[in-house]
């Protein structure tokens, strides 16, 4: 929320839309932000997109995912966590092009995406990338467990949109057993 004169005139062709967002002189943006030690505001997520864990703590899934996508080894990621779960977990889609070169340089043998994605050396590397990002997150928002997708995500199989956005509900259904394994301790 911000306070002051209206920061904008309104939404195009939606009269009265600003008034519904202003309460007692405060404009409610609908954004979740945090303040750094230097006083800077960092956008986390739309409030409507925050997820709540069993503890009642909320975490910003897209913020966590975006930070992890900065890793050259991670092509895509889907965080998992809801009111029925105690912690944040993640499913990782490795970057085959980058990791295949890395594996060849390290003389790690593999023949397929599945073979490479499930190698212990790859798990160690991804765990290090997650630990790097976790240092900057509050404890409840840190990724505690992860698994690598056993295959590259594919728009033709309905796992991604044509613009390569995750189809979360579809992925949660398709990989439900893998997700459950992260929470019952049978994975990672």
Description of each model-found segment:
Residues 9-16, 97-105:
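Cytochrome P450 core scaffold surrounding the K-helix E-X-X-R motif
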Residues 1-53:
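Conserved ATP-binding/catalytic segment of the ANL
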Residues 51, 76-78, 102, 123, ...:
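Conserved C-terminal "lid"/linker of ANL adenylate-forming enzymes
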């Amino acid at each position: 929320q911000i306070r002051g004169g209206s920061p904008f005139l309104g939404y195009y062709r939606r009269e009265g839309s600003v008034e519904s967002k202003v309460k007692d002189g405060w404009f409610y943006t609908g954004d979740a932000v945090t303040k750094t030690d230097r006083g800077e505001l960092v956008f986390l997520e739309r409030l409507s997109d925050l997820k709540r864990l069993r503890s009642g703590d909320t975490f910003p899934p897209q913020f966590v995912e975006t930070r992890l996508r900065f890793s050259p080894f991670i092509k895509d990621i889907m965080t998992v966590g809801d009111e029925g779960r105690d912690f944040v977990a993640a499913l990782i889609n490795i970057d085959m092009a980058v990791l295949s070169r890395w594996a060849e340089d390290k003389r790690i043998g593999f023949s397929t995406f599945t073979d490479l994605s499930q190698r212990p050396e790859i798990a160690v590397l991804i765990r290090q990338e997650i630990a790097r990002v976790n240092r900057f997150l509050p404890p409840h928002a840190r990724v505690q467990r992860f698994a690598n997708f056993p295959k590259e995500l594919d728009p033709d199989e309905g796992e991604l949109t044509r613009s390569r956005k995750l189809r979360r509900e579809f992925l949660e259904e398709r990989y439900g057993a893998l997700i459950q394994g992260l929470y019952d301790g049978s994975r990672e």
